Amino acid sequence: MSLKYTVEHEWVRPEGAVASVGITHHAQDALGDVVFVELPEVGSAFEQGAVAGVVESVKAAADVYMPISGTVTEVNEALRDDPSLANTDPLGAGWFFKVQPSAPAQIDALMDEAAYAALTGS
C-alpha cells in the first residue's frame, strides 16, 4: 500500500500488521535542519491525534502526532544518533516509529498523495 498523509504532515506506510510513521518532505523542509528527535516508548498506546514525539530543528520545535490509534512496536534508534536522517531521507531511513493499529480503518481515512499535494501546494 502506498503512503497516506495527515494534515499535521506525518506519513503512514502500512506494512502488514504494523505501519511505519514519519514526517513528510514538506515538514522537514519547513523545519530546516533537524537536530533532535524525541520518540515514544515502545509499548506505549496512543489515540489518533495524540502527541507521540517531538522534532527539534535549528528553527523550531514541533510535535509529532499519532496519525492512527495504536501501540508503538518499534522506534528508529538511528534517529537518536543521527537526527538529520529526518531531513536527508524522511520517507525512508528517517522513519520515526512503527505502530500496531487498533483501528486499521483509520489508515484508509487519511489523505492519499494527491490530496496531500493539494494541501501543501506541491
Sequence positions of predicted segments:
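Mid-chain, well-packed structural core segment of small domains
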Residues: A60-A93
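Acidic, low-complexity mobile loops and tails
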Residues: M1-V54, S84, T88-S122
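Short beta-strand "wing" residues that participate in macromolecule-binding interfaces
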Residues: S57
